[in-house]
Amino acid sequence: MKLRRIAEAKLPTPFGEFLMVGFEEIATGKDHVALVFGDISGTKPVLSRIHSECLTGDALFSLRCDCGFQLEAALSQISKEGRGVLLYHRQEGRNIGLLNKIRAYALQDQGLDTVEANLKLGFKADERDFTLCADMYNLLGIHEVRLLTNNPKKIEIMKEAGINVVERVPLIVGRNPSNAHYLDTKADKMGHMLFKKAQ
């Protein structure tokens, strides 16, 4: 177990009232949160989203990615379901950090795609550690999920970590002219299950 559960409080949102649960990485002190909606106890699989932190998309309304659109859509779907969990995985920029993400954006402005930009900066295409999310699920008492994702890597890692993903629920929102190439690159080079534009 890499995390410990630290604190919780009610979080009213436009989608209804969630319980915000805070976790801390034991080794680093870095924090992560889960937003819990409704009663997640029992044996029925829980609708869930693993959402990696994206300051630019989640808070600054960037159109370069689909993150903000996915965050809003996931919270809305969980609310409509009546129960569910969003894990807010604080690994900004696929875990290269905000400043390196800005550097990667600058390289993309020069014509590199999102994967090429990460590699040019000396990183892997995706540096995230999703095993932390399995720890969050376990600390919340969740063992079976219906996962809102387009990323097969998340499903694979959750299953390897003992979380049973019984269904993948697609979350395809927010495509626009500013992020179309980015989304196509995620589909082509990272295996994300997205509908591409007509060729």
UniProtKB/Swiss-Prot annotation:
Presence of keyword Flavoprotein: no
GO biological process: riboflavin biosynthetic process
UniProt cross-references to PANTHER family, sorted A to Z: 3,4-DIHYDROXY-2-BUTANONE 4-PHOSPHATE SYNTHASE, GTP CYCLOHYDROLASE II-RELATED
Name under which the protein is recorded: GTP cyclohydrolase-2
Required co-factors: Zn(2+)
Source organism of the structure: Proteus mirabilis (strain HI4320)
Enzyme Commission number: 3.5.4.25
Residues reported to bind GTP: R49, I50, H51, S52, E53, Q70, E92, G93, R94, T114, T149, K154
Region forming the signal peptide: none
Pathway(s) of this molecule: Cofactor biosynthesis; riboflavin biosynthesis; 5-amino-6-(D-ribitylamino)uracil from GTP: step 1/4
